[in-house]
Regions:
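An extended, acidic
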Residues: 177-178, 185, 190-198
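Conserved beta-loop-beta connector loops within the AMP-binding
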Residues: 168-175
Length: 250
Protein backbone atom coordinates (compact mmCIF):
# COMPACT_ATOMS: atom_id res chain seq x y z
CA UNK A 1 0.00 0.00 0.00
CA UNK A 2 1.18 3.51 -0.80
CA UNK A 3 -0.05 6.78 0.71
CA UNK A 4 0.55 10.30 -0.60
CA UNK A 5 1.24 13.42 1.43
CA UNK A 6 2.05 17.03 0.60
CA UNK A 7 5.24 18.99 1.02
CA UNK A 8 5.23 22.00 3.36
CA UNK A 9 7.09 25.32 3.40
CA UNK A 10 9.10 26.74 6.30
CA UNK A 11 10.61 30.20 6.36
CA UNK A 12 14.02 30.45 7.98
CA UNK A 13 17.13 32.61 8.17
CA UNK A 14 19.89 32.60 5.58
CA UNK A 15 22.84 31.94 7.88
CA UNK A 16 24.55 29.57 5.47
CA UNK A 17 23.96 27.54 2.34
CA UNK A 18 22.20 24.91 4.48
CA UNK A 19 19.70 27.27 6.08
CA UNK A 20 17.04 29.64 4.86
CA UNK A 21 13.61 28.93 3.46
CA UNK A 22 12.96 25.24 2.93
CA UNK A 23 10.43 22.64 1.85
CA UNK A 24 9.87 19.60 4.02
CA UNK A 25 7.81 16.45 4.48
CA UNK A 26 6.25 16.16 7.93
CA UNK A 27 8.63 13.98 9.94
CA UNK A 28 5.98 12.46 12.23
CA UNK A 29 3.97 11.28 9.23
CA UNK A 30 7.10 9.77 7.68
CA UNK A 31 7.79 7.94 10.95
CA UNK A 32 4.21 6.64 11.18
CA UNK A 33 4.36 5.32 7.60
CA UNK A 34 7.58 3.49 8.50
CA UNK A 35 5.98 2.17 11.68
CA UNK A 36 3.14 0.55 9.72
CA UNK A 37 5.23 -0.50 6.72
CA UNK A 38 3.30 1.80 4.40
CA UNK A 39 4.88 3.40 1.35
CA UNK A 40 4.84 7.21 1.39
CA UNK A 41 5.05 9.47 -1.64
CA UNK A 42 5.53 13.21 -1.16
CA UNK A 43 3.87 15.48 -3.72
CA UNK A 44 6.10 18.49 -4.28
CA UNK A 45 5.05 20.14 -7.57
CA UNK A 46 2.16 20.65 -9.96
CA UNK A 47 3.87 18.34 -12.41
CA UNK A 48 3.47 15.06 -10.60
CA UNK A 49 0.29 15.02 -8.52
CA UNK A 50 -1.99 13.30 -11.04
CA UNK A 51 0.47 10.45 -11.57
CA UNK A 52 0.97 10.14 -7.80
CA UNK A 53 -2.79 9.99 -7.29
CA UNK A 54 -3.04 7.04 -9.68
CA UNK A 55 -0.35 5.06 -7.87
CA UNK A 56 -1.43 5.87 -4.28
CA UNK A 57 -4.30 4.47 -2.23
CA UNK A 58 -5.02 7.54 -0.11
CA UNK A 59 -3.90 11.05 0.83
CA UNK A 60 -2.81 12.60 4.13
CA UNK A 61 -2.99 16.41 4.07
CA UNK A 62 -0.69 17.66 6.85
CA UNK A 63 -0.82 20.84 8.87
CA UNK A 64 1.25 23.86 7.93
CA UNK A 65 2.71 27.05 9.40
CA UNK A 66 0.90 28.92 6.59
CA UNK A 67 -2.80 29.78 6.92
CA UNK A 68 -5.07 29.57 3.87
CA UNK A 69 -5.64 33.03 2.41
CA UNK A 70 -9.27 34.09 3.06
CA UNK A 71 -9.69 35.05 -0.61
CA UNK A 72 -10.00 31.32 -1.36
CA UNK A 73 -13.28 31.25 0.59
CA UNK A 74 -14.70 34.59 -0.51
CA UNK A 75 -13.31 36.94 2.15
CA UNK A 76 -10.79 39.77 2.20
CA UNK A 77 -7.24 38.56 1.52
CA UNK A 78 -4.38 38.77 3.96
CA UNK A 79 -2.36 41.98 3.91
CA UNK A 80 0.40 41.28 3.20
CA UNK A 81 -0.33 38.13 1.21
CA UNK A 82 1.32 34.82 2.00
CA UNK A 83 4.80 34.44 0.55
CA UNK A 84 3.80 30.94 -0.54
CA UNK A 85 0.21 29.77 -1.21
CA UNK A 86 0.29 26.07 -0.41
CA UNK A 87 -3.47 25.80 -0.94
CA UNK A 88 -2.97 26.23 -4.70
CA UNK A 89 -1.29 22.81 -4.84
CA UNK A 90 -3.41 21.34 -2.04
CA UNK A 91 -6.62 22.06 -3.93
CA UNK A 92 -5.36 20.43 -7.13
CA UNK A 93 -4.28 17.31 -5.26
CA UNK A 94 -7.57 17.10 -3.35
CA UNK A 95 -9.45 17.40 -6.65
CA UNK A 96 -7.45 14.54 -8.17
CA UNK A 97 -8.04 12.20 -5.22
CA UNK A 98 -11.71 13.19 -5.09
CA UNK A 99 -12.14 12.42 -8.80
CA UNK A 100 -10.66 8.95 -8.29
CA UNK A 101 -12.70 8.30 -5.15
CA UNK A 102 -9.72 7.71 -2.89
CA UNK A 103 -9.75 8.27 0.91
CA UNK A 104 -8.31 11.46 2.43
CA UNK A 105 -7.29 12.45 5.94
CA UNK A 106 -6.72 16.13 6.77
CA UNK A 107 -4.80 17.23 9.87
CA UNK A 108 -5.07 20.75 11.36
CA UNK A 109 -4.48 22.92 8.27
CA UNK A 110 -5.41 19.81 6.29
CA UNK A 111 -8.99 19.72 7.60
CA UNK A 112 -9.20 23.43 6.79
CA UNK A 113 -8.03 22.80 3.22
CA UNK A 114 -10.68 20.09 2.82
CA UNK A 115 -13.41 22.33 4.19
CA UNK A 116 -12.48 25.21 1.89
CA UNK A 117 -12.16 22.95 -1.16
CA UNK A 118 -15.65 21.53 -0.68
CA UNK A 119 -17.25 24.95 -0.16
CA UNK A 120 -16.82 25.76 3.53
CA UNK A 121 -15.20 28.75 5.24
CA UNK A 122 -12.77 29.46 8.08
CA UNK A 123 -12.65 31.93 10.95
CA UNK A 124 -9.89 33.41 13.10
CA UNK A 125 -9.95 32.06 16.65
CA UNK A 126 -7.88 32.73 19.75
CA UNK A 127 -7.06 29.09 20.29
CA UNK A 128 -3.32 29.36 20.57
CA UNK A 129 -2.05 29.10 24.14
CA UNK A 130 -0.75 32.68 24.32
CA UNK A 131 -3.83 34.24 22.67
CA UNK A 132 -6.30 32.25 24.74
CA UNK A 133 -4.68 33.03 28.08
CA UNK A 134 -4.32 36.71 27.24
CA UNK A 135 -8.05 36.99 26.58
CA UNK A 136 -9.26 34.50 29.18
CA UNK A 137 -7.04 33.51 32.14
CA UNK A 138 -9.36 30.55 32.85
CA UNK A 139 -8.87 29.20 29.34
CA UNK A 140 -9.77 25.56 28.72
CA UNK A 141 -6.32 25.06 27.20
CA UNK A 142 -3.75 23.46 29.48
CA UNK A 143 -0.01 23.21 28.97
CA UNK A 144 2.26 20.41 30.06
CA UNK A 145 5.85 19.47 29.41
CA UNK A 146 6.28 16.13 27.63
CA UNK A 147 9.47 14.35 26.64
CA UNK A 148 9.38 12.83 23.17
CA UNK A 149 11.00 9.62 21.94
CA UNK A 150 14.11 11.58 20.95
CA UNK A 151 14.62 13.08 24.42
CA UNK A 152 13.36 16.55 23.51
CA UNK A 153 11.01 18.51 25.76
CA UNK A 154 7.75 19.44 24.03
CA UNK A 155 5.30 22.13 25.15
CA UNK A 156 2.10 20.13 24.82
CA UNK A 157 -1.13 22.18 24.70
CA UNK A 158 -4.32 20.20 25.32
CA UNK A 159 -8.04 20.75 25.80
CA UNK A 160 -11.14 18.57 26.16
CA UNK A 161 -13.36 17.68 23.20
CA UNK A 162 -16.85 16.24 22.93
CA UNK A 163 -17.20 13.32 20.53
CA UNK A 164 -20.14 12.03 18.54
CA UNK A 165 -20.85 8.32 18.80
CA UNK A 166 -20.54 6.19 15.66
CA UNK A 167 -17.78 8.41 14.27
CA UNK A 168 -14.16 7.80 13.30
CA UNK A 169 -13.08 9.75 16.39
CA UNK A 170 -15.22 7.63 18.71
CA UNK A 171 -13.76 4.54 17.05
CA UNK A 172 -10.37 5.56 18.47
CA UNK A 173 -11.19 6.98 21.90
CA UNK A 174 -14.21 4.75 22.63
CA UNK A 175 -15.61 7.66 24.64
CA UNK A 176 -17.72 10.78 24.13
CA UNK A 177 -15.05 12.81 25.92
CA UNK A 178 -11.28 13.05 25.39
CA UNK A 179 -8.33 15.43 25.59
CA UNK A 180 -6.46 16.36 22.43
CA UNK A 181 -3.66 18.74 21.58
CA UNK A 182 -4.42 22.16 20.09
CA UNK A 183 -2.13 24.40 18.00
CA UNK A 184 -4.20 26.51 15.63
CA UNK A 185 -5.23 30.12 15.07
CA UNK A 186 -7.96 29.42 12.49
CA UNK A 187 -10.90 27.04 12.67
CA UNK A 188 -13.79 25.79 10.56
CA UNK A 189 -16.72 28.21 10.33
CA UNK A 190 -19.33 27.23 7.73
CA UNK A 191 -19.05 23.48 7.21
CA UNK A 192 -18.87 22.13 3.67
CA UNK A 193 -21.98 20.37 2.42
CA UNK A 194 -21.94 16.60 2.93
CA UNK A 195 -19.67 16.65 5.99
CA UNK A 196 -20.75 15.75 9.52
CA UNK A 197 -19.18 17.45 12.52
CA UNK A 198 -18.17 14.63 14.89
CA UNK A 199 -16.19 16.47 17.58
CA UNK A 200 -16.20 19.93 19.16
CA UNK A 201 -14.24 21.62 21.92
CA UNK A 202 -16.06 22.98 24.96
CA UNK A 203 -16.15 26.45 23.38
CA UNK A 204 -17.83 25.10 20.24
CA UNK A 205 -14.88 24.97 17.86
CA UNK A 206 -15.14 22.16 15.31
CA UNK A 207 -12.45 19.60 16.12
CA UNK A 208 -13.26 16.86 13.61
CA UNK A 209 -15.52 16.10 10.67
CA UNK A 210 -16.09 13.24 8.26
CA UNK A 211 -17.81 12.35 5.02
CA UNK A 212 -18.25 8.60 5.18
CA UNK A 213 -19.62 8.46 1.64
CA UNK A 214 -16.37 9.88 0.23
CA UNK A 215 -14.17 8.32 2.95
CA UNK A 216 -12.82 11.73 3.96
CA UNK A 217 -11.82 12.49 7.55
CA UNK A 218 -10.29 15.45 9.32
CA UNK A 219 -9.04 16.51 12.74
CA UNK A 220 -8.24 20.05 13.87
CA UNK A 221 -5.58 18.66 16.20
CA UNK A 222 -2.41 16.68 15.46
CA UNK A 223 -2.81 12.92 16.08
CA UNK A 224 0.56 12.35 14.40
CA UNK A 225 2.20 13.73 17.56
CA UNK A 226 1.19 10.43 19.17
CA UNK A 227 4.13 8.64 17.59
CA UNK A 228 6.62 11.27 18.71
CA UNK A 229 5.24 11.21 22.27
CA UNK A 230 4.98 7.41 22.51
CA UNK A 231 1.18 7.51 22.80
CA UNK A 232 -0.21 4.37 21.12
CA UNK A 233 -3.88 5.41 21.35
CA UNK A 234 -3.98 8.13 18.71
CA UNK A 235 -1.84 6.06 16.35
CA UNK A 236 -5.10 4.20 15.74
CA UNK A 237 -6.28 7.14 13.61
CA UNK A 238 -3.61 6.17 11.09
CA UNK A 239 -4.07 2.44 11.53
CA UNK A 240 -7.79 2.84 10.82
CA UNK A 241 -7.19 5.20 7.89
CA UNK A 242 -4.71 2.80 6.29
CA UNK A 243 -7.27 0.02 6.66
CA UNK A 244 -9.92 2.15 4.91
CA UNK A 245 -7.45 2.86 2.09
CA UNK A 246 -6.63 -0.83 1.71
CA UNK A 247 -10.29 -1.84 1.63
CA UNK A 248 -11.11 0.93 -0.85
CA UNK A 249 -8.38 -0.27 -3.21
CA UNK A 250 -9.84 -3.75 -3.56
Amino acid sequence: MNIATLIRYKKGTYDSIWNGNSWFAHGNIVDIARHYGVGLTVIATDGDYEKVCQMCDGLIIPGSPINIDPSFYGQEPFDPRNEVEEYLLDSKVIAAFDKMGKPMFGICGGIQALNVFYGGTLERVSNLKTDALAENPSSHIEEEQRVDRYGNTVEYHTHPINIKKDSFVFDVFQSERARTNTYHGYALDRIASGFDVVARSDDGIVEAFECREKKIYGTQWHPELAYRLNDPLELKFFENFFRVCKENAR
